[in-house]
């Protein structure tokens, strides 16, 4: 009961904060300060992690860079705010960050009660389980009685409880606030099982002391549509963040890459001309509050969606995650962009 009351109070408080924070045009604020403030994970290889020099890279980081490129024509005009699962929502609601690009699941509660706008989904994921091979477990249905490491304040924690209850299994939750704490506890043997989004398991396995000693079980127990989130009340900023994603998708579909984007401006295809802002009467960029070079600037900065995926989490990365649902609609996946016209 106490937890429900606290949750209700938090929801009411952040709704009030959100209404104030979104009253001003975010684009104007971003331009005035000269950079995009992007909320990211505290450190998740492939998605958002700093190197020894403090330089950030990853799938979500590239989205932050793409937004900066669209707004300023300069992908370096972005600053990163590392946030834990517990910290991320207050940071967005209060205006501390302009956009949250932090492997965050879109849910009805977050979309309504917390006052966020999600969509589009830039990564379709699902929750899974990682165990030590020595446990001799082949299925999540064999995990009854196991100690399970999980991060609090996440859909992962809620899905875990639902899955074990539905399947009449018992488990002992080992709960931590920060991802680094969960990872360290699992690596130290404080729990038998690690559960989070499957993409996260592939990422976190790389950081373990003996990665090859661990396996990811086949079950996917949830739908985890991940993507950037912004505050409600600013449709222009929401449109910009959304169309940054769609530009990445459309670029891949058109075959426009980081290497050939300038050459593709010469394409006779009117759809490509319109997309790249070279059509004589194109107003797509200005309708967004950007220049007509917005899509070109995005692609020059980070490439297309396929390039962003492969470089950070796909075939060209240590994670080697397959595209799956995140392939384009015409290649067996469900990623596609609305018409650019």
PLM regions: where:
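Bilobed "Venus flytrap"/periplasmic-binding protein-like clamshell domains
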Residues: 37-46, 56-71, 105, 125-181
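Sec-exported extracytoplasmic/periplasmic mature domains
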Residues: 31-32, 68-76, 93-97, 105, ...
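Extended ligand-binding regions for polar small-molecule ligands
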Residues: 62-65, 69-71, 134-137, 141, ...
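Sec/Tat signal peptide C-region and signal peptidase I cleavage site
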Residues: 17-24
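Extracytoplasmic small-molecule ligand-binding "clamshell" domains
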Residues: 24, 31-101, 283-284, 290-293, ...
């Amino acid at each position: 009961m106490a937890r429900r009351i606290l949750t209700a109070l938090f929801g009411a408080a952040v709704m009030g904060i959100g209404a104030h924070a979104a009253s001003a045009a975010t684009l104007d604020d971003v331009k005035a300060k000269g950079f995009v403030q992007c909320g990211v994970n505290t450190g998740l290889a492939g998605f958002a992690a700093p190197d020894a020099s403090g330089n950030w890279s990853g799938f979500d980081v590239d989205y932050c860079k793409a937004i900066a490129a669209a707004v300023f024509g300069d992908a370096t005009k972005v600053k990163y705010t590392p946030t834990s699962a517990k910290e991320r929502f207050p940071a967005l609601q209060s205006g501390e960050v302009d956009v949250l690009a932090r492997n965050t699941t879109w849910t009805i509660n977050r979309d309504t009660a917390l006052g966020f706008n999600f969509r589009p989904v830039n990564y379709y994921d699902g929750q899974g389980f990682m165990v030590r091979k020595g446990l001799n477990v082949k299925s999540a249905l064999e995990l009854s009685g196991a100690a399970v490491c999980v991060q609090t304040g996440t859909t992962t924690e809620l899905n875990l409880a639902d899955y074990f209850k539905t399947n009449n299994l018992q488990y002992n939750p080992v709960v931590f606030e920060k991802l680094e704490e969960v990872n360290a506890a699992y690596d130290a043997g404080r729990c038998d099982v690690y559960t989070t989004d499957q993409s996260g398991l592939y990422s976190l396995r790389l950081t373990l002391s003996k990665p090859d000693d661990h396996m990811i079980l086949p079950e996917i127990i949830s739908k985890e549509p991940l993507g950037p989130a912004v505050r409600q009340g600013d449709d222009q900023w929401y449109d910009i963040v959304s169309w940054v994603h769609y530009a990445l998708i459309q670029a891949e579909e058109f075959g426009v890459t980081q290497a050939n984007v300038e050459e593709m401006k010469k394409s006779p295809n009117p759809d490509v001309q319109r997309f790249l802002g070279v059509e004589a009467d194109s107003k797509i960029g200005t309708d967004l509050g950007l220049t007509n070079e917005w899509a070109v600037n995005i692609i020059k900065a980070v490439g297309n969606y396929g390039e962003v995926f492969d470089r950070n989490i796909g075939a060209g990365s240590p994670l080697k995650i397959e595209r799956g649902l995140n392939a384009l609609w015409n290649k067996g996946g469900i990623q596609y962009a609305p018409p650019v016209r």
